[in-house]
Design a protein with these regions (language model features):
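Terminus-proximal functional modules
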Residues: 1-51
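C-terminal interaction-tip segments
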Residues: 145-166, 234-237, 430-432, 438-458
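Short, aromatic/His-centered strand-loop micro-motif at the edge of beta-sheets
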Residues: 180-213
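Low-complexity, Ser/Thr/Pro/Gly-rich disordered linker/stalk regions
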Residues: 49-174, 190-192, 244-324, 396, ...
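Edge beta-strands of jelly-roll/beta-sandwich modules across compartments, strongly enriched
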Residues: 41, 272-279, 444-455
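Short, solvent-exposed beta-strand-to-loop segments that form ligand-recognition rims
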Residues: 202, 232-255
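Beta-rich globular "head" domains
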Residues: 28-30, 126-140, 287-440, 449-457
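Localized edge beta-strand/strand-to-loop motifs within extracellular or lumenal beta-rich domains
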Residues: 209-225, 231-233
Length: 458
């Protein structure tokens, strides 16, 4: 017998109509919740609801879902794969392509050892005490022997995802680097062992060759609950609950700040190409959210000479590769910047470079604030290339006091701006860079300097 059923309610039935609801709940069925005039029922043969763990009408902390969720990240592929938002990593004949008609990204691989990984640059900030929700739409496609497909909220060290393994078996997985030995451990639960709904029969029988909407919500606090399932006909169907308090002796996951990701990995040469599609995804915080980062700033200690008609990277910041022996998975947002010039008018650009290699530096990068920051800075760069201009404008020379710096303080794009952040690359070896550039628009030299104020979020 199916572990769940959905009953269409007559229009005259109200949620508080206990007599009617008790009647349809007889004979081994328990009401979980009502949504859009449908009663979502669970078989009592599979166990009873405990502390709301099966009730999708409450969040991961058991709070009634009445608040508007705060979107931490949202990802679509309507106009292609945006390199400002995604990291693509391939090996062998692994391939990643955009399907403009499907508004999706396709991954494929054929040969042994090949892989294709499509991952957000953003490691989304988890706020303790808030329920975090991830939704991802996809088509895994038919299983291909020797190929593993994954989609969810994860990286190489930690995360939660749906997996189709080399034999075609489906499972929910929690990956963790909490052992402290450098090894990765994984809780893996096959579909036949999902403890709420296996989706193996009944009205909603999971067909992974069709479009699906994967659902995750979790408490972290290092010891909380994780729920996995799917959204079907507007109803969130919880399939498996991982409980960790009073069970594990260590945190279930080392880092809750993670990217959305999908991947294909081949362990053998496959007879046919293995493929999947990733369509759309979002990460949300429930019950309120404040991006409570740590604020730092740097400035040029001395003026730099900007010659006539030239451009100069006045000041730059980037993320360190390693923090306390771990990959640096913080992200940084500029809050404001200032540019000053003493003699001539200049144009300024706040630019985001995709790699440190795009900046020619005259000396080593320096750690900010005696290593309490996850950022390092440079004030001696001489050239730059490529980059995305986030902000631009002009600074006029001070006509009253020529030798007095004339600052222009400019507010920066806010939290909702998808491009106003820098992050590390896939393996935390080459950070994106914020660089403040001055361009001399006149026929005479001038002295320039700059400052940056930013937030570090992790």
């Amino acid at each position: 017998m199916s572990q769940h059923k959905i009953v269409k309610l007559p229009n005259w039935v109200l949620p508080e109509d206990e007599n009617y609801l008790n009647e349809i709940g007889k004979d081994g069925w328990e009401l979980i919740h009502i949504y859009n005039q449908h009663a979502y029922m669970k078989s009592t043969a599979a166990g009873t609801i405990s502390s709301g763990s099966l009730n999708a009408a409450v969040d991961a902390f058991g709070r009634q879902r009445v608040s508007e969720p705060f979107t931490l990240g949202d990802y679509k592929h309507i106009f292609g794969i945006e390199d400002q938002l995604f990291i693509n990593k391939v090996n062998g004949d692994g391939d990643i392509t955009n399907n403009i008609n499907h508004s999706s990204t396709g991954l494929s691989a054929t040969s042994s050892g090949s892989y294709a990984i499509h991952q957000s640059k953003m490691y989304h900030h988890y706020m303790p005490g808030k329920s975090q929700v991830i939704l991802a739409s996809f088509v895994l496609g038919a299983a291909v022997s020797g190929s593993t497909k994954r989609i969810g909220y994860f990286d190489d060290h930690n995360g939660i995802f749906l997996e189709q393994d080399t034999t075609g078996s489906l499972q929910f997985v929690i990956r963790s680097a909490t052992s402290g030995t450098g090894s990765i451990t994984e809780q893996r639960v096959k579909q036949s062992n999902w403890n709420v709904n296996t989706l193996s029969n009944g009205e909603f029988t999971l067909d992974i060759t069709k479009t699906q909407l994967f659902y995750i919500d979790f408490q972290w606090l290092a010891v909380g609950r994780v729920r996995c399932g799917f959204v079907h006909k507007g109803i969130t169907v919880i399939c498996h609950v991982f409980d960790h308090t009073n069970v594990l002796s260590v945190p279930y996951m080392q880092n809750p700040n993670l990217p959305v990701r999908c991947e294909i990995r081949n362990s053998v040469n496959t007879i046919i190409p293995s493929s999947m599609e990733q369509i759309c995804s979002t990460v949300m915080s429930e019950g309120g959210y404040t991006e409570s980062g740590k604020a730092y700033s740097v400035t040029n200690e001395t003026f730099r000479v900007l010659t006539s008609g030239s451009s100069l990277p006045v000041l730059a910041i980037r993320l360190k590769n390693i923090v306390n022996g771990m990959p640096n998975r913080a992200f940084v947002r500029i809050q404001n910047s200032s540019v000053f010039t003493d003699q001539q008018s200049v144009r300024y650009l706040l630019t985001k470079l995709p790699s440190g290699s795009m900046l020619t530096t005259g000396s080593a990068w320096l750690s900010v604030d005696n290593d309490t920051s996850v950022v390092e800075y440079n004030t001696s760069a001489t050239a730059y290339s490529d980059g995305k201009v986030l902000l631009s404008g002009f600074v006029g020379a001070n006509s009253l006091n020529i030798n007095q710096a004339n600052p222009l303080v400019q507010s920066q794009p806010g939290v909702t701006n998808k491009q106003n952040f820098i992050a590390q690359n896939y393996d935390s070896t080459d950070s994106e860079v914020y660089v403040l550039i001055a361009k001399n628009m006149t026929a005479n030299n001038t002295n320039v300097g700059g400052s940056m104020l930013w937030s570090e979020i992790y």
